């Protein structure tokens, strides 16, 4: 095991710039081991040097076990490739791997971050430095020259090649795309700061015999937009995020809206405010991206979401949080990656969670061909545009809402039905279907579950 010394801060002003879509590209193996946290008193400003009053040693073990120096046991999960969260002895630690603005990152050191008890009644500041492995690596995708201000060129032959290459789905030209720059389309697909590669190897859990037995009687198809028992649909209308990279906020709000309707038997039917998340969340980067685990999960539990009428959606990052502390908010609790930790998610668990508790956010890798999707069961093609001599549409991570699954009656292909946030004119009236059972584009890796608080 390796020693790592970290800085954990509770100051929101610092957090705003450190909590989501960083250039870090770290793995389970990087986080696994023995970490030492130095803790100090709460301060109103980020300290350059912390007067540490105590330290805590926490060991992160396989697959999701956390044990502190006193023998208390808890759990932990990697947060994509950006950091991890530990819950132990009624306290939560949010750790984001250290990085610099030039794209350098260090998987054995943290940025200033949060620690607070699970009741959010008391918080602390802690800081530290790396003991060993004090080496920064470069994420070449982050901050690379991208010609981002160039207007996107629609190449009709590219769409034609997509349709000729395969028959599972059909692409279509959306003329409005030519009005946007490459950076604006990146924002729409996840945000310029989500241009990070998915870990090549996940600490993935395969379905157990018990799980296979438990899910053996699940229906062949299920769709919350049209429940099979004829009941009301809890799925709220399609949103259009515009060119703001707020996709992480839309499915987080939509999932909470749906689950509140189900738990309350439709006695409560809020339409929540993703704009509040864009303006106020210390766990994301406004219009530059974020992750549902930190929004539907942590932000929903720590801060809650007010209704849309409080802060309507503008698709802009104002940088100012104007929400009254006294407004009614809807909260989440008991959030986690499906399966308990990042890497534990699989198809069967996703089906079970979907049917049992309602729609939930997922993330997946967006390639250039996806923006031209019109209908059918999407899978990434190897077709490349020949207009540019570089790849202008670098890989991003896009968050969406899983609402159903089924099997195509013509092709026999299994699929997930997913709600996007690009308006009703895109795809299948705002939805798309994507290949199920193969972790296509990572769609079976980032499912997030939570319970609504009523």
Curated annotation (Swiss-Prot):
Gene Ontology process terms (BP): proteolysis
Molecular function GO labels: cysteine-type peptidase activity
Superkingdom to which the source organism belongs: Eukaryota
Function: Thiol protease. Has a role as a digestive enzyme.
Cofactors, names only: chloride
Keyword Nucleus on entry: no
Keywords, in A-Z order: Disulfide bond, Glycoprotein, Hydrolase, Lysosome, Protease, Signal, Thiol protease, Zymogen
PANTHER family: CYSTEINE PROTEASE FAMILY C1-RELATED (PTHR12411)
One Pfam family cited in the UniProt record for this chain: CathepsinC_exc
Active-site residues per Swiss-Prot or TrEMBL entry: 247, 398, 420
Location of the protein in the cell: Lysosome
Annotated family: Belongs to the peptidase C1 family.
EC identifiers of the protein: 3.4.22.-
Cofactor remark from the record: Binds 1 Cl(-) ion per heavy chain.
Prodomain residues: 21-217
Catalytic EC class: hydrolase
GO cellular component, one term: lysosome
SS bonds (residue pairs): 26-107, 244-287, 280-321
Glycan-carrying positions: 25, 265, 326
Entry protein name: Cathepsin C
Signal peptide from the UniProt entry: 1-20
Positions of chloride binding: 291, 337
Record keyword Signal present: yes
């Amino acid at each position: 095991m390796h020693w790592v010394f970290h800085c954990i801060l509770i100051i929101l002003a610092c957090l705003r710039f450190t909590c989501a879509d960083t250039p870090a590209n770290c793995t389970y193996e990087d986080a696994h081991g023995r970490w030492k946290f130095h803790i100090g008193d709460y301060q109103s400003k980020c300290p350059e040097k912390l007067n540490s009053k105590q330290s805590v040693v926490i060991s992160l073990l396989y697959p999701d076990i956390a044990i502190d120096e006193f023998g208390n046991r808890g759990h932990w999960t990697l947060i994509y490739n950006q950091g991890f969260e530990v819950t132990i002895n009624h306290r939560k630690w949010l750790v984001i791997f250290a990085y610099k603005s030039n794209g350098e990152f260090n998987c054995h050191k943290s940025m200033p971050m949060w620690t607070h008890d699970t009741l959010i009644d008391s918080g602390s500041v802690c800081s530290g430095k790396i003991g060993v492995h004090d080496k920064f690596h470069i994420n070449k995708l982050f901050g690379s020259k991208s010609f981002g201000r160039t207007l996107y060129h629609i190449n009709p032959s590219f769409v034609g090649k997509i349709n000729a290459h395969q028959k599972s789905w059909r692409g279509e030209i959306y003329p409005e795309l030519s009005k946007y720059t490459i950076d604006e389309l990146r924002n729409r697909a996840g945000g310029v700061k989500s241009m990070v590669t998915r870990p090549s190897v996940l600490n993935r859990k395969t379905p157990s015999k018990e799980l296979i037995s438990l899910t053996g009687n699940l229906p062949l198809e299920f769709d919350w937009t049209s429940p099979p028992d004829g009941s009301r649909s809890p799925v709220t209308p399609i949103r259009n995020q515009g060119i703001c990279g707020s996709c992480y906020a839309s499915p987080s709000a939509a999932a909470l809206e749906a689950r509140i309707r189900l738990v309350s038997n439709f006695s409560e039917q809020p339409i929540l405010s993703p704009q509040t998340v864009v303006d106020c969340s210390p766990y994301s980067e406004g219009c530059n991206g974020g992750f549902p685990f930190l929004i539907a999960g942590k932000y929903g539990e720590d801060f809650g979401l007010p209704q849309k009428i409080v802060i309507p959606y503008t698709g802009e990052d104002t940088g100012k949080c104007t929400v009254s502390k006294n407004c009614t908010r809807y909260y989440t609790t008991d959030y986690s990656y499906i399966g308990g930790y990042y890497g534990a998610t699989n198809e069967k668990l996703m089906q079970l969670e979907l049917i049992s508790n309602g729609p939930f956010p997922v993330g997946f890798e967006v390639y250039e061909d996806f923006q031209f999707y019109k209908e059918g069961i999407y899978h990434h093609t190897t077709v490349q545009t020949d207009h540019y001599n570089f790849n202008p549409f670098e890989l991003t991570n896009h968050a969406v809402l899983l609402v159903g699954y089924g099997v195509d009656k013509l092709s026999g292909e299994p699929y997930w039905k997913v709600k996007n946030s690009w308006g009703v004119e895109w795809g299948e009236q705002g939805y798309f279907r994507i290949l199920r059972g193969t972790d296509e584009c990572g769609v079976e890796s980032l499912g997030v579950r939570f319970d609504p608080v009523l």
